[in-house]
From Swiss-Prot:
Top-rank taxon: Bacteria
Region (Disordered): 95-119
Family according to the record: Belongs to the bacterial ribosomal protein bS6 family.
Keywords, alphabetical: Ribonucleoprotein, Ribosomal protein, RNA-binding, rRNA-binding
The protein, known as: Small ribosomal subunit protein bS6
Gene designation: rpsF
GO biological process: one example: translation
Disulfide bonds: none
GO CC field: cytosolic small ribosomal subunit
Keyword Ribosomal protein: yes
Length: 119
């Protein structure tokens, strides 16, 4: 099995369906012995340029270890899901488990907000 980094963007009106989508995609990966090494929900973020007249999207990052058949099933699930605006699959040499720089930045912001609220 190979390691992949997957990022997909969901239509902002469908943000409440993201947990169900993630569980469905996780079950596809784990159905034949694959594993999800990292799963990060980056939330709604501004797009660099409009896509289908949208300026925001809900981002999700997954680092998975799976076979080619599961990856093909995942990409076809992305393709046929109208809520998924864009997706990107990158092949990795090894599993990435540490938090991404974007997730680390979100944690720092949350810590600052909590300290400001405590004062």
């Amino acid at each position: 099995m190979r390691h992949y980094e997957i990022v997909f963007m969901v239509h902002p009106d469908q943000s409440d369906q993201v947990p169900a989508m993630v569980e469905r995609y996780r079950s596809i990966v784990e159905s034949s012995g694959g594993t999800v090494h990292r799963l990060e929900d980056w939330g709604r973020r501004q797009l660099a340029y409009p896509i289908n007249k949208l300026i925001k999207a809900h981002y999700v990052l997954m680092n998975v270890e799976c076979g080619k058949d599961e990856l093909d099933e995942l990409t076809s699930a992305f393709r046929f899901n109208d809520a998924v605006i864009r997706n990107m699959v990158l092949s990795r040499d090894e599993a990435v488990t540490e938090p991404s720089p974007l997730a680390k930045g979100n944690e720092k912001r949350e810590d600052r907000k909590e300290s400001e609220d405590a004062e």
